[in-house]
């Protein structure tokens, strides 16, 4: 079953190595807050796709405040000139949530070659620029090992190279223990919109086994 379940969701839990992307407590308003979280993520991911956002962690410590932590490869794009872009995001979120206390923290992802979300987005951007899918996949694999990755699997699906019939091609190097719960495996997907149609990209990156100090918040 290791190949049929999301590697991230499979490891989410208080005793496992992955944490939730939304931290809140709501008895009756869970549905409303959940939809708000989806809209906030959509606003950030689509509005700043050039920043290559890796993760958006939303915390609601009380009914009056919200804390948004954004991990991105290029945080300067999100910050904007003199913080102009952050102010726009804050105003949009204040209007969306009706909250006056909106806090946004932006973190730079330094080891972006072993971040599955950023790697998938990078491959998708290259495919949109008509770079060969094989070259894009192999380049990502080589870069991952240089930054400490112990295993990587990359998959591309669609009309690869403009072929008439859609197909899936993938490369794998190193270890990929999908069944091992203590294995720190990062997984993400991305879409490349090309003239031939949409090409789906999937990336799995194995970073080593779980240790107490490596656990995500």
Swiss-Prot record:
rRNA-binding found in the keyword field: yes
Domain KH type-2: 40-110
Keyword RNA-binding: yes
GO cellular component: cytosolic small ribosomal subunit
InterPro entries reported for this sequence: KH_dom, KH_dom-like_a/b, KH_dom_type_2, KH_sf_prok-type, Ribosomal_S3_C_sf, Ribosomal_uS3_bac-typ, Ribosomal_uS3_C, Ribosomal_uS3_CS
One GO molecular-function entry: mRNA binding
Keywords tagged on the record: Ribonucleoprotein, Ribosomal protein, RNA-binding, rRNA-binding
Pfam families membership: KH_2 (PF07650), Ribosomal_S3_C (PF00189)
A single GO BP: translation
Subunit structure: Part of the 30S ribosomal subunit. Forms a tight complex with proteins S10 and S14.
Family according to the record: Belongs to the universal ribosomal protein uS3 family.
Primary role: Binds the lower part of the 30S subunit head. Binds mRNA in the 70S ribosome, positioning it for translation.
Entries under HAMAP family matching the protein: Ribosomal_uS3_B (MF_01309_B)
Name the record gives this protein: Small ribosomal subunit protein uS3
